[in-house]
């Protein structure tokens, strides 16, 4: 297979990059009590000794904390990016300097270079895969099926990846077990809602230097991510409009007090459009034709297919970089539509993208770490297919977080527990 070289050999000044990345990783670790606790436990018990972990993730400081936690547990790790624009090269270089880690991630790698890096990870013959978006798992199945027999299992971080895996599982095409980390409460209720809401809005505001107050903000999709974006935007005094295709979610958004309408109508009134659906062609030519001059378009879904930029380019008479991270498309009538981060994941792919807040990702990556531990320890218990994260693992992460926050909570008495498990007690 054609593979890419490690990041350190591709940088002009790898030592300087490592120093910058190391500082970012150390700062993240200082604010990640869950991973810090797991790192101490893993270092003592070596639960991943002898394993090789292949990863395709957003390679930035918080991810690096997860990578180093698993390396300290005894694993050899090979990692690359899961999005062409989300890698922080300094962080990648700092990881590559670790004796048990090889990093192939580099910002800007796309097309053939992107998949060469994935192939480089797979050349390490991983026994566990840790994925964000599903590209690593699908590359294994489509191009390197000879690796499947030695892969214990994997984990998937994000909504889009889980959707892809479930579709694969429905077709009986998924040949090893994968935990749907995205769907477990300690990830979904915090990372998807608070993480996406805060980081997407913060990155849009910093990239454009515009305020949310008084803006008509169109949120496409009212799943966990869209719910978080809508809540945070409303909290900054924006007027929130929600578009949906699922009637119950549309009703939920309506009952939460948001305006709900089809995208064709929202296109005529929105100032800022933010897609959170995980689907393609959410905003297309027909919508661009209705939009006002100066609108801002951004995507918080995993792939760059939600805002159809081919349609927009066909409509435009000129394009320019209006500001770093902002691509302006001028239409024939003089209207200008502004796309952030090339339509990619705005909270990570924008020039100032830092991703979700550290504390939120500590929870998600804590779940990732214990899921990998579980796969290795109990490898015979999981058949091929998508698996929910065992509830006891999710609770373990919640307990570590509460202890770190100094929060105490009640426990059921034996009598209460017996009552909850019984069916004989009626009126």
From Swiss-Prot:
Keyword Membrane tagged = no
* Pathway(s) of this molecule: Amino-acid biosynthesis; L-homocysteine biosynthesis; L-homocysteine from S-adenosyl-L-homocysteine: step 1/1
Q: Which CDD domains match?
A: SAHH
A Pfam family annotated for this chain is AdoHcyase_NAD
The domain of life is Archaea
EC assignment: the record states: 3.13.2.1
User: Which Gene3D superfamilies does this UniProt record tie to the protein?
Assistant: Adenosylhomocysteinase-like (3.40.50.1480), NAD(P)-binding Rossmann-like Domain (3.40.50.720)
Catalysed reactions, semicolon-separated: S-adenosyl-L-homocysteine + H2O = L-homocysteine + adenosine
**One GO CC term, this protein:** cytosol
Q: Which cofactor does it need?
A: NAD(+)
- Where in the cell is the protein located? Cytoplasm
One GO MF term attached to the UniProt entry = adenosylhomocysteinase activity
Tell me the GO BP annotations in alphabetical order. L-homocysteine biosynthetic process; one-carbon metabolic process; S-adenosylmethionine cycle
Cofactor binding remark = Binds 1 NAD(+) per subunit.
What protein family does this chain belong to? Belongs to the adenosylhomocysteinase family.
Q: Which NCBIfam families match?
A: ahcY (TIGR00936), PRK05476.2-3 (NF004005)
Question: What is this protein's function per UniProt?
Answer: May play a key role in the regulation of the intracellular concentration of adenosylhomocysteine.
Q: What protein name does the entry list? A: Adenosylhomocysteinase
Lineage here is: Archaea, Methanobacteriati, Methanobacteriota, Stenosarchaea group, Halobacteria
Its gene is ahcY
